[in-house]
């Protein structure tokens, strides 16, 4: 009887040791994922401090720190129109501790430049955070009151009307040329500046005729007083209910917004991704975060990872086709 009990006890102990060993020898990714995050998370912003990407990322990072109990640290890695920072994340570990926070410039850059990564495949979409329509501003005394009149004016003066951009291949150029193509082929001159601020200054001075920009860019500047004749969202901007959309004025399915979202490297740990998606959805729908976004002329935008992936791919294709059509895409 004693021998039988002793044998059973040895079997039980051996089994317990094996079970404990299995837990201890679990892969690092399994151990990390079970309690993600258990250390600080880096949020890479591929632009210099102070811009909308940086400002929104910092507010989001603070909210994530409060909800998940770990620091979310901002690292600014500017260069090549978001390529430097984006490429850094594309090559990062897939454990969920390196995240890219970026605007739709991820798509416009991929549409114009030859990037070291395939934007549609190199990243794991996590969640959208916010979006903002663009606004079409005119110089004073141009003599038109709405988009239809502007289109007619450009057609009557082929090659003589000019518009401003923040640089070759930026949002403003691509969306202006897309609109020109969709309304039947308008001939205009594109004037590229080093940033949107000098373009807006020249619009105020009357040196250029119009430009697409964001409310965040003109807030507190003289450009905010210029005529606003159209917004590019799917619906009218709540702050300017009397200004119709491009879609309303043309009948075209023309909707272009700047959006902000979070991505990881392709193949990122799915549990970490899903935790982030759920937390970001909660954060952006709080009244405090919504009020914060309003100060930037933006509004909350929630999505599933798959929806963000479709949004990115659609924009990459649209801007690639536009850049090729006007001959500015790098070979």
Describe each PLM feature range.
Residues 1-38, 330-331:
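Short, low-complexity disordered leader/linker segments with a strong preference
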Residues 2, 38-40, 270-331:
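An extracytoplasmic/periplasmic, membrane-proximal ligand-sensing/linker region
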Residues 31-121, 160, 168, 184-212, ...:
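N-terminal (or domain-start) structured segment
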Residues 52, 56, 60, 85, ...:
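Hydrophobic alpha-helical segments typical of transmembrane helices
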Residues 91-97, 111-198, 246-248, 259-292:
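Hinge/capping helix and adjacent helix->loop/strand transition within the periplasmic-binding protein
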Residues 101-106, 175, 196, 212-218, ...:
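Beta->alpha turn/N-cap motifs
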Residues 217-285, 314-317:
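C-terminal lobe and pocket-closing loops
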